Swiss-Prot record:
This is DNA-directed RNA polymerase subunit beta'. InterPro entries: DNA-dir_RpoC_beta_prime, DNA-dir_RpoC_beta_prime_bact, RNA_pol_asu, RNA_pol_N, RNA_pol_Rpb1_1, RNA_pol_Rpb1_3, RNA_pol_Rpb1_3_sf, RNA_pol_Rpb1_4. Zn(2+) 1 binds at C66, C68, C96, C99. Its cofactor is Mg(2+); Zn(2+). SUPFAM superfamilies: beta and beta-prime subunits of DNA dependent RNA-polymerase (SSF64484). It comes from Karelsulcia muelleri (strain GWSS) (Sulcia muelleri). Its EC number is 2.7.7.6. Signal peptide: none annotated. Zn(2+) 2 binds at C838, C912, C919, C922. Binds 1 Mg(2+) ion per subunit. Residues 1204-1219 have a biased composition (Low complexity). One of its GO terms (biological process) is DNA-templated transcription. GO terms for molecular function: DNA binding; DNA-directed RNA polymerase activity; magnesium ion binding; zinc ion binding. Belongs to the RNA polymerase beta' chain family.
Length: 1464
């Protein structure tokens, strides 16, 4: 294909449609009928005529040679030459008059199709063996009934005719009849019945096989069937039956949609079978004389043999039973060809392997979609082992000469020819293969400005492929820069990497500008630097910047000296006047608020040497360098300078780090590790505490669960104390120059856990078990030995279990993490930045992430790079800090930190109104480069990769956090954050104890404006230490509560009376164990009930029956469920559960219980009250003259002054569980997750609405990652959750085209409601001929028609207002979201390929190629980045063709003018 043709075909593929082929279309595409089952003649080795490889049908095997040998290549070329001489320029196909073969290229054998004329119709297996059953849904037959009809076991009544009422027969349409029943009916009805025409309603017709199904399908009126099903659904009361009817309804709708676009329903019955081109089912000759054949040839042969045999049997009028058996066999043969895996007994080869059918070649990892269309192998690539290249620059890699010579071969040949070193291509190739020295100089020249791409498998995120400037090296291993290892997740223990060469100018330009390693310093997952020194480099930098003081034994050279500049220090160090660790004074420039200021500071020589390579703009960095501080420094330098400066800085610190790690000689020995003396006493004390806990349990003072938990906590605390002792000893040893401590403290290697196991104790171990039950995952007796002492046999045996489980888990989770990433990518691959601003008025509220009031992630780090939704004000003076629609960046983030703002409302992908993709403003900053996101960025794929990439770091099991008991007290009180005045809100108090459910305390500033500085919810039962309108100071305690138990407090003085109470055998406590509505009552002296309390299950009663109590006494304690165990069921299983939006089976249904009010610590005035009515709806405003539609999402639009004051909201978590307080809207109930037992997502969705459910989902997912120390920006989760929540379920369809129970895209739903909004529904058409009953008509047209009818004295049309559809939001799992995407190509290449393709075909779907996958499949440029449709990138890279032509024209005109002047 020429370049011109390629360009045309490339840009023409804008959409692709799929429909069912009719027999006429199959014949039109076919080049001839295949009659014989033979393939190749064993004597001549040539294809058999009219066989499966026939040259007449499919084209010649050799170029321009026919079957009989009349036309050879030379002869054909001569004929063509003669024809061209006769000016017959259009040389059409030339056919051999002997054998009928067209004289053409053999490539036609890849495209030409044949066909088989089937003797009897055959049903396509996808039509009756898929779920839901397509043919069964149309005809109302079950799968078993269909099977009996198709495989010739039963007759089906097509038309009962006279048999319906004749001679006591009661036969209905679609009744199944056995052979005996059929014969009986034929004998009963008159003999003349068979002579009637088929269209005669009195004729009895019953048939079997595909033939009868074809007739039944032709007779079906889909529109009538649709309305019948709708009526049936309306009247149906059984839920199960309704679900089945909905499934049928959906299938019928698909067929109706397809029919409108030209599909024929009867085309699902095959009369002509297409045969694919022979080159796609090859027959390859083997060395031994045999042939290796594609499985498809076997299938086609079976079909042809059976088809021919059936034809012959019909011709000789064989008995019906034999014919029926042959027809069934033919049906089975076609079934096997189309989908062998769907058959109960799959056709197998001689080696008992199921043969690969047409469907199998599309499905799965080895199928056409994933193997050949989405995962192509590429030319110009190489692969080799990687070794470290410490002398390389960040953008360079070392490329072995052999690899370079091979992949740059075409460029090398061109240069050799241009320089006239060789004359022909062949001789150039010889020169290269000889490795002539001359080629290396040319290669060096070629490498300049022509980068290579390096890729390490598995490519989990976009940094798995980066481009480098190659340098020629000797040897066979690729040199890799050590700083890019973390991005590739590479190490030098035998890892291999692939090299790819970008060929076109556009590809080279993109590799240079976008993919160069020095451009990819930041991690797209979180925006932090990923190109950070590690291991040796960190250790070297830590060592050089550590200070060492002189002691009596050893003096440090140069300590206390003063220097005027950094250079002076360097000279002194080079001349060995000062030592690297010496503490000195030096005049440096320090960065302060005003700018760079000169100061004399106390520092070390090593820090001065480090600062020589630091960019001057940044100022002097006087820090001990560790892994964490280096990350912050690199980040700061990157945002305050530029990428080239940062890349140079990274290279310099890499060299410094390696040099000083080598100079320091930082190895370690056994003496660097020692066991603390306090170990014995700590262990002894722990054993005593454990025995005391056991005694308490035996006495019945605590429950078994509490005993277990306390023992685990004792050992955990002991372990922590011991670890601290070990690390303190190391810290003091050699002034902190203990090698092991330096490795730990710098973050170069090791962790506190490993140090603890070396010289403390191994600690608690996991219990060997298959399933993890709550609170029994850990062995109570820890391993008391450490690795220095050595383990006993029992201890060793216990510890081996964990080690082995770890290895098994790693293997399992790698596959799980890969599958999770694939599902995420598929669900979000079409999310691309499409527009600048969607102009939404909605956003989300963000506050700091807290764990028990301890800040885990600050507000500033969470809102960095986001766009402010409204103006952000300073709470103290109401000054605007950040304007609406402004990005929150490093420059203005300090303002937020100083102003002590708790919550900020920002734009979010969750609330973006863009119909396709997301807008720039709602996304904010591109985390990969720190700039505002650009149009065309494929943020869906980036989000999926960012979430999936750390998947392998997550565990597969439940693990114990431990140490919970000691920490809880700190988080069971509220302190004042500022000085101010206390204000009560809905608080009822009995003896300083809160007895109201929705209590709140506000802290106001002591000014006239009374700005709210802090707002906290107060739990029921909390003890108050302040009164209303009281002045408090910062850090004063406002209230406290029991962190272990929720309580119920007596509101009156009186006597206790209760029923349905049981005693705990062990503890003697009264415990509620069954729901017999147990109640506790307070009665007065007259036995009148003052107050009655319902008691929740699991509650402990503190009072006895008949006790006299005072108001404010505690009656009941309800142990908080989460305290039973400090275990986190985390890792991949939990993540998968959340992304698939699965509901837990054991969700506690507190909403339905009578005890719910005891748990409700929510704020009644929260932002989500409106979500109780969570339906999307339209309101038709009759007074609205403009006929504008008003669609209401039921969001709380709040335009009073408070809505702009983001500071006035505060979050508070009274729960003592380990959940993070991850705030998406601090006024919501779910800012604190104060719920006993997990509430399912669907319950939150139903009760609190979509935003609360989205927030809860993101909260839960982030908790899994945070528990493992993985940082991922919220934006990525928001993009995925947006994809999961972009659809609604139709509750009432009204007058729209929707079906109740259908799932629709939100924008489609809103568009449909908008379309019908100004229309009217005709109830009676009157005398109008223009309109009919049930029609939706524009009001103006209706008015006009009624006016005309009135003039003619005719009956007017009666109409009513339209009823719009009502829907509710739903959450779909990522698998479902990926399968139900708008693109059928994308869905088919993900999962359930055959189902997706068949459903697309019957409804004649069109794929508009908006996503990435569908364009990759078709070989188009992906519509992202530089390939974005309607983008300006084309002009930037390729240039505007018209401008070039204009330039050429102007140049030609200039030349002509000059020539004319010369002539004159």
């Amino acid at each position: 294909m020429s370049k011109k043709q390629y360009k045309i075909s490339h840009f023409m593929t804008t959409k692709i449609s799929l429909r069912i082929s009719s027999p006429e279309e199959i014949l039109k595409d076919s080049y001839g009928e295949i009659i014989k089952p033979e393939t190749i003649n064993y004597r001549t080795n040539k294809p058999e005529r009219n066989g499966l490889f026939c040259e007449k049908i499919f084209g010649p095997i050799k170029d321009y040679e026919c079957f009989c040998g009349k036309y050879k290549k030379k002869l054909y070329k001569e004929i063509i030459r003669l024809r061209q001489l006769n000016k017959e320029l259009k040389v059409k196909g030339l056919f051999c008059n002997r054998c009928g073969v067209e004289i053409t290229k053999n490539t036609v054998r890849r495209t030409r199709m044949g066909h088989i004329n089937l003797v009897v119709p055959i049903v396509h297996i996808w039509g009756f063996r898929s779920t839901p059953n397509k043919i069964g849904s149309i005809l109302g037959l079950s799968s078993q009934q269909l099977d009996m009809i198709i495989y010739y076991e039963r007759y089906v009544v097509i038309q009962p005719g006279i048999a319906n009422s004749y001679n006591n027969l009661s036969i209905k349409k679609l009744d199944l009849l056995t052979e005996e029943e059929y014969t009986y009916i034929l004998n009963k009805i008159p003999i003349g019945n068979k002579y009637l025409y088929d269209n005669d309603p009195n004729k009895f017709i019953a048939k079997m096989g595909a033939e009868c199904l074809e007739e039944l399908l032709i007779r079906v009126d889909l529109e009538v069937l649709l309305s019948d099903l709708k009526k049936e659904i309306k009247n149906e009361e059984s839920k199960q039956r309704k679900i089945e009817l909905f499934k049928r309804l959906n299938v019928v709708e698909c067929f109706i949609e397809g029919k409108k676009k030209g599909n024929k329903i009867e085309s699902i019955i095959l009369k002509v079978l297409p045969v694919i081109p022979p080159e796609l089912r090859p027959l390859v000759p083997l060395d031994g004389g045999g042939y290796a054949s594609s499985d498809l040839n076997d299938f086609y042969r079976r079909i042809l043999i059976r088809n021919n045999r059936l034809k012959r049997l019909i011709h000789i009028s064989a008995p019906e039973i034999i014919l029926r058996n042959e027809k069934r066999m033919l049906q089975e043969a076609v079934d096997s060809l189309l989908d062998n895996s769907k058959k109960i007994l799959a056709v197998k080869s001689e080696s008992n392997r199921p043969l690969k059918s047409l469907s199998d070649s599309l499905k799965g990892k080895q199928g056409r979609f994933r193997q050949n269309l989405l995962g192509k192998r590429v030319d110009y690539s190489a692969r080799s082992v990687i070794v470290v290249g410490p002398k390389l620059k960040l953008h360079e890699c070392g490329l072995p000469k052999e690899i370079a010579a091979e992949i740059y071969k075409p460029f090398l040949i061109r240069k050799l020819l241009e320089r006239k070193i060789v004359r022909t291509v062949k001789s150039a190739k010889k020169l290269i293969s000889k490795k002539d020295p001359i080629i290396w100089d040319i290669l060096k020249y070629l490498l300049k400005g022509h980068p290579v791409l390096l890729n390490r498998a598995p490519t989990l995120h976009r940094l798995g492929i980066q481009s480098f400037q190659p340098k020629l090296i000797e040897g066979k291993a690729i040199l890799l820069h050590p700083l890019v290892c973390s991005a590739f997740n590479a190490d030098f223990d035998g890892d291999q990497m692939a090299v790819h060469l970008p060929l076109s100018n556009e590809a080279i330009l993109e590799a240079k500008l976008l993919m160069l390693a020095s451009q990819n310093i930041l991690n797209p997952a979180n925006g932090y630097p990923i190109t950070v020194p590690s291991q040796d480099m960190v250790l070297g930098l830590y060592y050089m910047t550590k200070e060492l003081k002189s002691t009596y034994e050893s003096k440090i050279k140069g300590e206390g000296m003063c220097f005027s500049s950094l250079e002076e220090v360097e000279i002194a160090y080079n001349n060995k006047v000062v030592e690297i660790h010496a503490i000195i004074k030096v005049k440096v420039k320090i960065l302060e608020n005003i700018g760079l200021i000169s100061k004399i500071i106390k520092t070390t020589v090593g820090r001065v040497l480090f600062n020589i390579v630091v960019p001057p703009k940044v100022g002097y960095i006087n820090k001990l360098l560790t892994n964490k501080s280096l990350r912050k420094i690199i980040n700061y330098i990157l945002y305050n300078t530029n990428i080239p400066t940062t890349a140079k800085f990274l290279d310099k610190i890499k060299d410094l780090g390696y040099y000083h790690a080598f100079k320091g000689g930082l190895s370690f020995n056994l003496n660097d590790i020692s066991i603390p003396k306090e170990k014995k006493s700590l262990v002894k004390r722990a054993i005593e505490k454990v025995s005391l806990v056991k005694d308490n349990y035996n006495l019945g003072l605590i429950t078994n669960n509490e005993r277990y938990n306390q023992i685990i906590d004792i050992w955990t605390n002991t372990n922590v104390s011991l670890t601290e002792k070990v690390i303190n000893y190391m810290r003091k040893s050699k002034q902190g120059f203990n090698s092991v401590y330096m490795m730990l403290d710098s973050g170069a290697r090791s962790s506190k856990e490993q140090i603890r196991q070396l010289s403390g104790m191994r600690g608690l171990m996991a219990k060997p078990q298959k399933t993890s039950s709550l609170g029994s995952e850990i062995i109570e007796n820890p391993i008391l030995s450490n690795f220095l002492e050595g383990l006993s046999i029992l201890e060793y045996f216990i510890s081996t279990h964990g080690a082995r489980k770890g290895l098994a888990d790693t293997a399992l989770k790698t596959a799980d993490a890969g599958y999770l990433t694939r599902r995420l990518v598929d669900s979000a691959q079409d999310v691309i930045i499409q527009e600048d601003d969607c102009k939404t008025l909605l956003g989300i509220k963000i506050s700091a992430v807290k764990k028990k009031e301890k800040i885990i992630e600050t507000l500033s780090s969470r809102v960095l790079g986001r766009i402010a939704l409204n103006n952000i004000y300073d709470p103290t003076n109401n000054n605007v800090l950040i304007k609406s629609s402004q990005m929150i960046d490093e420059k203005n983030i300090n303002l937020i930190e100083k102003a002590s703002i708790d919550t900020i409302e920002v734009r979010s992908p969750l609330t973006c109104k863009s119909k396709t993709g997301i807008c720039r403003k709602c996304y904010g900053r591109n985390l990969a480069n720190g700039l505002m996101i650009q149009k065309g960025e494929a943020i869906g794929v980036i989000a999926a990769q960012s979430i999936g990439e750390p998947g392998t770091q997550l565990t597969l099991r439940t693990f114990h956090v431990g140490g919970t008991a000691g920490n809880i007290y700190e988080y069971s009180k509220i302190k004042a954050k500022y000085d101010g005045i206390i204000e009560y809100e809905d608080i009822q108090v009995v003896k300083n104890l809160v007895i109201s459910r929705s209590s709140e305390i506000r802290l106001l500033n002591n000014h006239k404006d009374k700005v709210i500085l802090m707002k906290k919810k107060i739990p029921y039962g909390a003890k108050l230490y302040v009164s209303n309108k009281q002045l408090v100071k910062k850090n004063d305690i406002i209230c406290s509560w029991d962190p272990y138990n929720a309580v119920i407090i007596a509101e009156f003085t009186g006597k206790i009376r209760y029923s349905n109470i049981e005693r705990d055998e062990q503890t003697g406590f009264k415990v509620i164990s069954e729901r017999k509505t147990p109640t506790l009552k307070i009665v007065n002296k007259k036995n009148e009930i003052l107050k009655s309390y319902n008691i929740p299950v699991g509650a402990h009663l503190v009072v006895n029956d008949g006790d006299i109590i005072n108001e404010g006494s505690i009656l009941i304690k309800i142990p908080i469920k989460d305290l039973k165990s400090g275990d986190i069921t985390g890792g991949l299983p939990r993540l998968s559960e959340l992304f698939e939006a699965r509901n837990d089976d054991d969700d506690d249904d507190y909403y339905d219980s009578d005890y719910y009010d005891y748990y409700d610590y929510s704020d009644d005035d929260d932002d989500y009250d409106d979500y109780d009515d969570y339906y999307y709806n339209y309101d038709d405003d009759e007074n609205d003259n403009d006929n504008d539609y008003d669609y209401d999402y039921d969001y709380d639009y709040d335009y009073d002054s408070d809505s702009h004051n983001s500071y006035s909201h505060n979050s508070y978590s009274p729960s003592s569980n380990d959940n993070y307080d991850y705030d998406y809207d601090s006024d919501s109930d779910y800012d604190s997750d104060y719920d006993y037992g997990d509430i399912s997502l669907n319950e939150i969705l139903d009760i609190k609405g979509l935003r609360a459910a989205q927030k809860k989902l993101i909260n839960e997912i982030q908790e899994v990652y945070r528990s493992q120390g993985v940082k991922i920006n919220d934006k990525h989760f928001e993009v995925i959750v947006r994809q999961m929540t972009q659809k609604v379920e139709i509750i009432k369809s009204g007058d729209t085209s929707f079906l109740e129970g259908n799932i629709e895209y939100t924008d489609v739903f809103l568009e449909e409601n908008k379309r019908i909004l100004n229309m009217k529904f005709i109830e009676e058409s009157g005398d109008s001929k223009k309109f009919f009953k049930g029609q939706l008509v524009n009001f103006h047209e209706l008015k006009k028609e009624n006016y005309l009818l009135k003039l003619s004295n005719k009956n007017k049309i009666l109409f009513r207002d339209v009823i719009t559809a009502i829907s509710k939001p739903i959450i779909q799992g990522i698998t479902k979201a990926a399968l139900q995407t708008k693109s059928f190509l994308s869905a088919a290449s993900f999962q359930e390929t055959t189902k997706v393709l068949y459903e697309a075909a019957i409804s004649n779907k069109t794929d508009y190629l908006n996503g990435l996958k569908e364009n990759v499949i078709l070989g188009n440029k992906i519509p992202a980045g530089t390939g974005l449709k309607k983008s300006s990138y084309e002009e930037i890279i390729i240039g505007d063709g018209n401008q070039k032509l204009k330039k050429k024209d102007s140049e030609i005109n200039k030349k002509l003018k000059i020539e004319n002047k010369i002539l004159k």
